[in-house]
Every structure is written in structure tokens, then in C-alpha cells.
UniProtKB/Swiss-Prot annotation:
The keyword NAD does not apply. It is found in: Cytoplasm. Binds 1 zinc ion. This is Protein SprT-like.
Amino acid sequence: MNLTDYVKEVSRQDFGIEFQHTASWNSRLQTTGGRFFPEDGHLDFNPKFCKKGDAGTFRKIVRHELCHYHLYYAGKGYRHGDKDFKDLLLQVNGVRYAPSIQSNTFYHYYQCESCGQVYQRKRRMNTKKYACGNCHGKLRHQNQS
């Protein structure tokens, strides 16, 4: 079953209303579970929440975005702060906020040879070009995690 069919099924079962547009994956989403676009009515979802393995959480995220969708087309308040949105979200048991995702970010660690200050960086840096910010000592690349 593709994503649009799944969203249509959730809309039919939980709202009793048909979903008329498309749903797609958007891997550029970082902290949000999904987005609703009022301009053309399509929904974007973060694939990280589906890959996490918790189908119940992803279904709640779909309900959240469908609340935006159905309220917008009903001419009611569809934004997060609107009472109509909060009431419908509570009624269908959707999530208010997307749960945090454990990131598997790779870090490089650098330690000053003089003062022992440790620096954590996401990107590797040239230790010949940079020095310690405290004592201007030489930096040494540590084991990465």
C-alpha cells in the first residue's frame, strides 16, 4: 500500500471523510512529523517516523495532518492554536507534537594538548589550521563516535 492510499484509509476510518489529494514522503523534514500545504492540499510526511517501527505513532501523525486538511476545507480554524483544531485532534486521538527521533549523528572530538579542552564537531576540521579557543594550543583529533 502506498502512502496516499494509507492516508485515504486513515481518513475514511478515523474521520469518515474522503481524502482527495496526494500524500508524499519528504526526507528534508528534520523535526516535524508532517506538513499540510493549503495552496494545493497535499500532505508531506517525514519517513524517519515510519522507519522507526512504531506504526501507532505514525498513524497519530497522519491524523494530526488530516485535522489540518479537513478543517481547512471545512472553512474552520485549522492552525495549531485554533480551538477547532485542538478539539478535533483530541477527538481522533492525534499527537499534538511529533516525538523526538534519536539521531545517529557522527561526531568528531578534538582535544587541546596544552589545557585538555575537548571540542565536539559534526564536521572534520584541519588541526593544522585551527587552535584551541582557550589557550591557543595545538588540537589533536580523538576517536570519533
